[in-house]
């Protein structure tokens, strides 16, 4: 009986460890993916957008550029 209890506890601990390892691996992959997105976004050049009659405005991301993407002038 004692041996059975020890085996059950050992199996439960092993299962918990595997579950934790799988979750950590999944979480690690998610973290890597997020940091890749950030670094890709940081490498993109800042763009200048034509904003109607108001004129040009520099945006932090390409997503902010609407409706036209233009390269920033070298003077600016």
UniProtKB/Swiss-Prot annotation:
Cellular component, GO, one term: extracellular region
Keyword Ribosomal protein annotated: no
Tissue-level expression: Expressed by the venom duct.
Report the main location listed first in the record: secreted
Task: Please indicate which superkingdom the organism of origin belongs to.
Answer: Eukaryota
Q: Mind listing the UniProt keywords for this protein, alphabetically?
A: Disulfide bond, Neurotoxin, Pharmaceutical, Secreted, Signal, Toxin
Q: Does the keyword Signal apply?
A: yes
Maturation and modification: May contain 4 disulfide bonds.
- MF annotations from Gene Ontology: toxin activity
State the signal peptide span: 1-43
Q: What does the comment on domains in this protein's record state?
A: The cysteine framework is XXIX (CCC-C-CC-C-C).
Q: Which family does this protein fall into?
A: Belongs to the conotoxin O1 superfamily.
Protein name according to UniProt: Conotoxin Cal29b
Q: Which organism is it from?
A: Californiconus californicus (California cone)
């Amino acid at each position: 009986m004692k041996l059975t209890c020890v085996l059950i506890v050992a199996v439960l601990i092993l299962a918990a460890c595997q579950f934790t390892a799988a979750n950590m691996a999944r979480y690690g992959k998610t973290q890597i993916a997020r940091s890749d997105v950030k670094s890709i976004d940081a490498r993109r050049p800042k763009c200048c957008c034509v904003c109607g009659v108001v004129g040009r405005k520099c945006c932090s991301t390409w997503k902010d550029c609407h409706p036209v993407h233009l390269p920033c002038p070298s003077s600016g």
